[in-house]
């Protein structure tokens, strides 16, 4: 269960097509209800896609997860109430009903989403160090275990055992998890 003052990233479910309005309303409500210390950041993951129309290709931004908005917040009762009662928010993902508080995203999940958006992210505290055995949780080597041989600037070199021989692979820090 989440302590009443844990900070984390949470996923809001919204009516599809209302993501920008929810972001706008939520930021306004955070200011109105004096919650700017609790409701820290609101993001709508987008991606650039090429659309061909009338023989012309055009780049457009589209929502990566239609009907969902990410919010970084300190989960107090008051902040939960303000967010939950924002117009066009239908609920929190990971909330198990009965007015229970939701489960935050895992650090690796939010890191991957923000990096895919080209966002700068805070450096996350990690206990991973050279010599540790870790599991790759994202990318081409997902599911493999490897030994950390070097960590530099959020890049990690791992020694993997593939096809009976050891191979060095370089992955991003967000792509691995401690075992």
Curated annotation (Swiss-Prot):
Q: Which residues form the signal peptide?
A: none
Record keywords, A-Z? Transcription, Transcription antitermination, Transcription regulation, Transcription termination
Quote the gene name from the UniProt entry.
nusG
What PANTHER family does the record point to? RHO-INTERACTING TRANSCRIPTION TERMINATION FACTOR NUSG, TRANSCRIPTION TERMINATION_ANTITERMINATION PROTEIN NUSG
Annotated KOW domain residues: 130-157
Question: Entry's Pfam families?
Answer: KOW, NusG
Name of protein: Transcription termination/antitermination protein NusG
HAMAP family associated with the record: NusG
Q: Does the keyword Transcription regulation apply?
A: yes
Has the keyword Transcription been applied to this entry?
yes
InterPro entries reported in the protein's UniProt record: KOW, NGN, NGN-like_dom, NGN_dom_sf, NusG-like, Rib_uL2_dom2, Transcrpt_antiterm_NusG, Translation_prot_SH3-like_sf
